[in-house]
Amino acid sequence: MLEIKNLYFRYSRRSPMVLDGVDLELRPGEIGIVLGKNGSGKTTLFKTIIGIHKPEIGTLNFDGTDLLKLSRRQRAEITAYVPQRIQFGAMTVYDTVLSGRISRFGLNPGKHDRFAVEQILDDMRLNDLASRNVEKLSGGEQQKVAIARALAQEPRVLIFDEPTGNLDLANEQLILSEARRLAAEKMISILISLHDLNQALALGDRFFFMKEGRIRYAGGSEMVIESVIREIFDADVRMIDADGSRIIVPVQNGAHGD
């Protein structure tokens, strides 16, 4: 289980806390959705989990292992991260995905590593692009390659920062379906930030609402209610029932009913 307790982080001693006492728990096989406005601390939290940022105070454990005591490479055997902004070198799609295996094989990939990459390319529908230069791909295609590279690490915790932002509807559904499959079949703990609240509600098992560097609310789908969304996003919404599913809709000015 991923366990974060009392996590604090700031960029300098004179700057305010960006993470201000974050507590979070996520079990194997669960999909946790981190929700909040831009600047609430979501990306900083993700970068702290994977080791880019070092917290000032707090603990960060996975299944009893203190992640803060691990090297970046050791932590890459447990955590993988797909950022919002992706940077690639001038490599093929195949080699880019294979580079995700470095935490496993070092610089000498074996047959098992190449088989794993081929399977991931197939799952992500990237076979036809395997020999293409990643820098020449569309933004959506690059996003899929970044996710495939993260999967190649065989992580126990997989973190997505707005993974569907550059994707068309078909590829968006592919990514979300893949997240569900990985959580269910491989018992990976998946942490995702999403801007689409209805997408989040349909996908998540647990929800973490962030504001000003703190997780203000955490829980299951019962936590996704109008009052919480209004407080976190400063937006007026209404929950409606549509064929047995809850849908979140914005309330237009003057559209309040009884």
Segments (PLM) and residue ranges:
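The feature captures the beta-strand-to-loop junction immediately N-terminal to the Walker
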Residues: 35-37
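Conserved ABC transporter NBD signature motif
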Residues: 58-66
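Conserved ABC ATPase signature
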Residues: 133-137, 141
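Catalytic Walker B motif of ABC-type/P-loop ATPase nucleotide-binding domains
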Residues: 158-162
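Helix-to-loop junction immediately C-terminal to a conserved catalytic motif
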Residues: 50
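A short, flexible loop at the N-terminus of ABC-type nucleotide-binding domains that lies
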Residues: 1-4, 8-21, 69-71
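Conserved ABC ATPase "signature" region
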Residues: 111-129
